[in-house]
């Protein structure tokens, strides 16, 4: 079992936390992480691109000139693709780019990124993040006390709204619950700040 230092909100070390090696101590599988990140980024695409094909362009119902006898090339519609103002051939249509990977793959990717953060000493465990009211300044003090000045993902337990509200105006700070944090969220962060309760939730979800 790997041990990480456990801090309180003032930055004081209070004890250590034992981490499950099956989740936080595996050999990271970079290939699987790559596949999951690509999948999650694809799902974020809006996919609302659209152009008009010849059936969608207004007009063009009448044959522009008779089939034979004019000396010109035969034409059936002024909205054919070769005409200026005509429809687009095989253009983009609205669609979803999202696709799902097997659950085992997604879980392995999560274990890989958590293990990588622990191995790189970018995993900061805190006893709790409790605030009497949403205060950005108070959350900034916590980050300063823990010497966190880079892009950080804060993982909290479900229902800790004050922590999320306190952090949302801070640059380079993102907040997610332990059960919903994605591989993309974790990869995008330089450090993880995780509450003790959130660690238990992660171990329950990925056990």
Swiss-Prot record:
Q: Which UniProt keywords apply?
A: Ribonucleoprotein, Ribosomal protein, RNA-binding, rRNA-binding
For this chain, the annotated S-S bridges are none
Q: Identify the GO cellular component terms for this protein.
A: ribonucleoprotein complex; ribosome
Q: Where is this region: Disordered?
A: 49-78
Q: InterPro entries given for it?
A: Ribosomal_uL4, Ribosomal_uL4-like, Ribosomal_uL4_dom_sf
What biological-process terms (Gene Ontology) are attached? translation
Give the function comment from the record: One of the primary rRNA binding proteins, this protein initially binds near the 5'-end of the 23S rRNA. It is important during the early stages of 50S assembly. It makes multiple contacts with different domains of the 23S rRNA in the assembled 50S subunit and ribosome. Forms part of the polypeptide exit tunnel.
| Self-association and partners | Part of the 50S ribosomal subunit.
* UniProt record similarity statement: Belongs to the universal ribosomal protein uL4 family.
Extract the HAMAP family matched here: Ribosomal_uL4_B (MF_01328_B)
Q: What is this protein called?
A: Large ribosomal subunit protein uL4
- Coding gene? rplD
